[in-house]
Amino acid sequence: MNLNHNNITFIIVTFKSENIIHDCLKTLPKDYKKIIIENSGNPKFKEDLEQKYDNLEVLLSENLGMGASNNIGIKRCNTKFAYVINPDIKFKENTLSELIKGAEQIDDFSILSPISNNSRYPNYTLSKKISVSSNILSVDCIDGYSMLINKQKFRDDIYFDENIFMYLENDDMCMKKKNEKENLYIIKNSLIDHLGGKSSDQKHKKDIELLRNWHWMWSKFYFNKKHHGIFYALFRSLKSFFSSIIKYFLYAIILNHYKKKIYKMRLLGIFNSILGKPSWYRINFKN
């Protein structure tokens, strides 16, 4: 398939990402369109970025989460392909050129991505290794921090599940496309760096960790229930549920209040998901 600057738009969801977004943007090619969805609604963030970078539009939004915010950007762009990336990734000099070369060897795809530069943390999963060529790997799932999406494969205009605030929204999308017999590929000659856990300002690290634990547990139960049914979801949650209870009381005994709060958040995430409540938990940042 033919990929170029005329048919790809980069989509980046940010939340208080001032300290990291510039490192990401500087590695992206200047002649490609970019849309940033800023979930903190910060007008100064929008003004600063749009003044500094060409071909860039910043949309201000309330804190909708990864799935809903990415959907805004994907639907906003008028190109055939939307390249969803996290603000804590960096392209190498030849990341995009090698991705394009790989795509030229493929007749058709739904989602495509470079491969993680860190082999210990692959950005894909597969049940059986299927190599289309020495450079192209057919996979079951691709991590959400780098997903080149072929919009023509989403004719219903439904991309990420907006019920999910964060975690497993990419797994949900990939499972849907695989069930539809669509193709997902990793291009092995195209490398990408992912810093991991650096997407937001680190001064909010503790609050964000609480948020992540709540939503990780909520999303796991929701995902399993959606794709495998309520009983499977309950069964898969048992170990995490009892482990969180034990650790909650353990950290209460040794007076580690922050760790205790983490496991409280995990329990609350599971409970809310079991009760069918939405992924509502947010942090009220003061600045």
Report the location of each language-model feature.
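Short, well-formed alpha-helical segments that are part of the catalytic scaffolds
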Residues: T14-K30
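Acidic donor-binding segment of Leloir-type glycosyltransferases
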Residues: L25-L59
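Glycine-rich, basic loop-to-helix element that forms the pyrophosphate-binding segment
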Residues: L60-C77
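Short aromatic/hydrophobic "clamp" motif used to bind/position activated sugar donors
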Residues: A82
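Conserved donor NDP-sugar-binding/catalytic core segment of glycosyltransferases
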Residues: K90-Y124
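A recurrent flexible, glycine/aromatic-enriched loop bordering the glycosyltransferase active site
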Residues: S131-Q152, I208
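A short, conserved alpha-helix in the catalytic core of glycosyltransferases
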Residues: S146-Y159, N163-L191
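Non-catalytic, C-terminal membrane-associated alpha-helical segments of glycosyltransferases
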Residues: L211-S219, I230-N287
